[in-house]
UniProtKB/Swiss-Prot annotation:
CDD domains: Frataxin (cd00503). PANTHER family: FRATAXIN (PTHR16821), FRATAXIN, MITOCHONDRIAL (PTHR16821:SF2). The keyword Metal-binding applies. Involved in iron-sulfur (Fe-S) cluster assembly. May act as a regulator of Fe-S biogenesis. This is Iron-sulfur cluster assembly protein CyaY. SUPFAM superfamilies: Frataxin/Nqo15-like. The gene is cyaY. One of its GO terms (molecular function) is ferrous iron binding. It holds the Pfam family Frataxin_Cyay. HAMAP family: CyaY (MF_00142).
Length: 108
C-alpha cells in the first residue's frame, strides 16, 4: 500500500469514528471528541479515554484504551489487530461500550 493509499484509508477511519461519536451524542451518550492532527481523543463521562491515532511510518492505526494498547494493519480490505486479527471497528465498539457504560457501535 502506498503512503497516499494508507492516508486515505486511515483518514476514512478517523472520519467514521467522528461520525459515530457525533451520532451517539445526539442520543444517550456524552462523549467529548477532540482531534489534534492525526490523533482522536474520546473522553467519556467517567473521565476515561480512548485514543485513536495514525502511525504513518508503520502504516498502522493504534488504539489506546483501558483494555490496553492495540495496533492495526490493513489486511484483505479491513484493519486487523496485528496480534489477534480482531477487526478495528469491532474492537473499538467493545472498548467504547465498556468505558461508556452504554452500548455504542462503530462501523466503517
Amino acid at each position: 500500500m502506498s503512503d497516499t493509499e494508507y492516508l486515505a484509508r486511515a483518514e476514512a477511519v478517523l472520519a467514521a469514528v467522528e461520525r459515530t461519536v457525533d451520532a451517539a451524542n445526539d442520543g444517550d451518550h456524552d462523549i467529548d471528541l477532540e482531534r489534534n492532527g492525526s490523533v482522536l481523543t474520546l473522553t467519556f463521562e467517567n473521565g476515561s479515554k480512548i485514543i485513536v491515532n495514525l502511525q504513518p511510518p508503520m502504516k498502522e492505526l493504534w488504539i489506546a484504551a483501558k483494555a490496553g494498547g492495540f495496533h492495526y494493519r490493513f489486511v484483505d480490505g479491513e484493519w486487523r489487530d496485528t496480534r489477534t486479527g480482531t477487526e478495528f471497528f469491532s474492537a473499538l465498539t467493545d472498548y467504547a461500550t465498556q468505558q461508556a457504560g452504554l452500548p455504542i457501535t462503530f462501523r466503517a
